Amino acid sequence: MNSKIKKNNFTGELFIVSTPIGNIKDITLRAISVLAKADVVAAEDTRQALKLGNLLNFTFKKLISYNDNNASIKDNTIINLMLKGLNVCVISDAGTPLLSDPGYTLIKLAINNNIKISAIPGPSSLLSSLVVSGLPLNSFYFVGFPPKKNVLRNKLFSKISFMNSTSVWFESPKRVVSLLEDMIKVFGKIEGAFLRELTKLNEEIIRGDLSFILSNIKDREIIKGEIVIVLEPLDLSEKFEISENIKVQIQSLLQNNSLRDVVDTIVAQTGKSRNVIYKYSLSEKNKLKKL
C-alpha cells in the first residue's frame, strides 16, 4: 500500500454510500443528497449507477468505475481527487459497499492521508437477511462468497463448525444447490434460511432444515437473483467425535451391510457429521478387505 501523498490545504471527503438492494424506495434522503452533490461517484458498475441516477432524477457530476478489476489502479487516483478538494462517493451495485466488494485499501489510504471518511448507512442484504431469518442474532459471522475449490471450502466448513455463531453466506444462483449439498454432508440436519431477491417483487424466503430448503429449489430449471443463506449457530465438536460404542456398531454393521447403508443408519441414529462417519466407515471397510 502506498504511503501518504502530498496534499493541498483543502481536502475533500470520502463517503461510503449504501444504495437499494432491490427497492428504490429504500434509498435514504441523506444518500440522495450526498450523491447529488458529490464531485465524483466511484461505482462498481457505472451502468448500474446511471440507472440509479435516472430513477432518482439526477445526473452525477462525474462518474468513474471502481471494482475488483481496477481497484489497485484507481485507489491512488481517487485519493488524489480528494486531496485536490473534491468529495468522492463510493457505491456498489446494491447495498453497502465493502461487504464482498472492493474498498478496504481505499479506506486505509484515506486514513493514512487524514481524509475524512463518512458512512451513509442504508440497505444491506447482510442485515436484512439476518433479521428475517428467524435465527439468533446475538452473534453472527459474515462468510460472504465461499471458495469454489473443494480444499478451501472444506477448510471454511471446518472453521464454521466450531464457531457457535449464526453465519451468513452469499452464493450465485448457479452454485447454490451444490453449496447446500456440501453443507448437508458436513453439517447434517441444521436449521437455516434461504433468501432470494430481498425487497423485490419476487422476494422469496424459505426457512427450515437444509434438506427441506434443498428439496424446494434443486429441481428448478432456473434460479434467479441475489441469494443469501443463513445458518443457525454451529458448535459441532460433538458431531466430529466418534465414541467407542459407535465404532463398534459400525464395525458390526459393515459385516453384512453396504457402506452406504451403514453410513445412513449411523447418521440417522446419532446425528453425527456424515463426512466423519463416512470416512471412518470407509477406513474400516478397507481393513475388512485386507483380512
Language-model segments: which ranges?
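A contiguous loop/helix-start segment that scaffolds small-molecule binding in enzyme catalytic cores
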Residues: 11, 87, 166, 170-291
